[in-house]
Amino acid sequence: MKKKILASLLLSTIVLSVGAQVASAENLESSKTTGDVTFIHGGKPDVTKPEEGPKEDGEILEDDLDEDGNPIPLPNNGGIYVMHLPNFSFGDKNQTSVKTKEYPAVTEERKLKDTKESFYMPHSVQVSDVSGNENATWKLSVVQDAPFESKDNSKLTNTRIRIFGNTFTNTLHDSNALAEKITGVGLDTSDTASANYSAIPVAGAEEGALTVLENTVKGFTNASTTSAVFSNGYLEENYSPEKTNAAEAYEGVKLNVPASDQAKAKKYTTQLTWTLAVEPGVSELAPTE
């Protein structure tokens, strides 16, 4: 008899338990699942023509190449990449003078990546930020390694490259949004001979380095490309293989040659060093090699 009562109680318990589960399932109106994603900083993107933003599909240009057609290694740090650095040429028909004189630079040759068509535009620098680092700021600066010098060791000791113009572009933001966030060449020096400018200093001359492009707000440039074009009022539509297919002098960059340097009728050259500084440096997660 006791066994029958116990079995009956167990059966009742099971039936009640199942009934409770069915009732619970019938009354459940919603449930949750999860989703997740983790990012690491991106690889080097394409070089693009400096254009007013926001614009993600700008014209793609060739990488900076050496004389053998190989890509030139450019500074990078934690997903922040220098995309383009300029070579400055001031032409080969400059007349010497008894006075201090400024010689304008000639526009720089750039090439479309797909068609290899050339066009010429003012000198520029470009930095892409795919760091994914919300705290990152960065600065690109330049210094001239030594005075202009000829093969027979004649030097232009006090000759300096001067920058007279600046236009900033960014692929995520229009120019108005860049104010006080993107800075660069200060154009804060003047003399009686020319308009305001900034000079590229010579190393070892206690002149420091010249900042040419800087993001001053943490994370502002993440997922974008920023350019500084050394010309006031630069508009990208003015430069193309159809419109500017030959080099020409322009006023944004000039070489200031004092009479005291006594320039000779010969070719002078120099080298420039460009440095990228990133804070706080490498982001938390980086691609594995």
Residue ranges and their predicted role:
Residues 1-8:
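Bacterial Sec-dependent N-terminal signal peptides
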Residues 7, 21-289:
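Signature of Gram-negative chaperone-usher
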